[in-house]
Each structure stands twice: as structure tokens, then as C-alpha cells.
């Protein structure tokens, strides 16, 4: 009987843990940049995405161009989507290592861009 109760409690605990994980808000970093060479910039961002994957970091990078944005039309936006702020901190730490592939790619990216805006957004759950 004790094993049945313990098993039931374990199942409830796992269910609650899964529900909590599902409801955790996603964090989105939105970076507006100026770059003279969008094609090279996109290539370096794609390289960085692959390096994050190799490192096992759950990061999704996307490059956007504003098309209906008034005076900001044409602005290049990079979004960095991570599960939470703790993961974002791990990503920043990994990027700061100068002798790593991630650090080398960031140096190349920094050389061909100027950041004009940098914001963090947290997903609102319905």
C-alpha cells in the first residue's frame, strides 16, 4: 500500500513539475543593428546558431528586416529566444570566452554591426 501511495505521489509531482515547466515564460532579446553587409551578417548569425547547438544551449536566433515600420523601415533586427533568464545568462557567459568558437564568431559579428537598440521581452501567459 505504501508503494502505491508513493508511486501516486511521484506521478502527481512529475505532472506538477511538467506543468510548471510549460508555464515558464520565454525570454526574447531583441537587438536592432546597422550593418553594411546583411548577407555576411546573416551568415555569421547562422554560424553562431550552429555553435549554440553544438554547445547544447537552447537558443533560437532569427534575423528580420522591418518592412512596414515608418522611419525604421529597413532596420535589421536579431531575436535571441531562450527559455528563461538563467539560460540567457549562460549564453552571455559562453559568448564572453575569447578562446572559444562562440567568442570568435561574436568578434566577427561585432566587427560588422553597430547595435542601435537592445531590449529584453518576457512572454505573457494567457
Where are these regions (language model features)?
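N-terminal targeting signals for Sec/Tat export/insertion, comprising classic cleavable signal peptides
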Residues: 29-65, 76
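Bacterial N-terminal signal peptides that target proteins for export
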Residues: 1-9
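Short, solvent-exposed mixed-charge patches
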Residues: 124-126
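An amphipathic, aromatic/His-enriched active-site/gating alpha helix that lines ligand/cofactor pockets
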Residues: 46-62, 71-72, 81-118
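Soluble periplasmic/extracytoplasmic beta-strand elements of cell-envelope proteins
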Residues: 32, 79-81, 119-122
Amino acid at each position: 500500500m505504501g508503494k502505491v501511495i508513493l508511486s501516486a505521489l511521484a506521478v502527481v509531482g512529475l505532472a506538477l513539475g511538467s506543468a510548471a515547466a510549460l508555464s515558464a515564460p520565454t525570454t526574447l532579446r531583441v537587438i536592432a543593428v546597422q550593418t553594411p553587409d546583411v548577407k555576411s551578417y546573416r551568415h555569421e548569425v547562422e554560424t553562431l546558431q550552429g555553435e549554440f547547438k553544438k554547445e547544447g544551449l537552447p537558443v533560437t536566433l532569427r534575423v528580420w528586416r522591418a518592412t512596414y515600420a515608418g522611419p525604421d523601415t529597413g532596420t535589421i533586427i536579431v531575436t535571441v529566444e531562450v527559455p528563461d533568464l538563467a539560460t540567457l545568462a549562460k549564453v552571455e557567459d559562453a559568448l564572453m570566452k575569447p578562446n572559444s568558437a562562440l567568442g570568435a564568431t561574436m568578434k566577427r559579428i561585432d566587427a560588422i554591426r553597430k547595435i542601435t537598440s537592445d531590449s529584453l521581452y518576457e512572454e505573457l501567459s494567457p
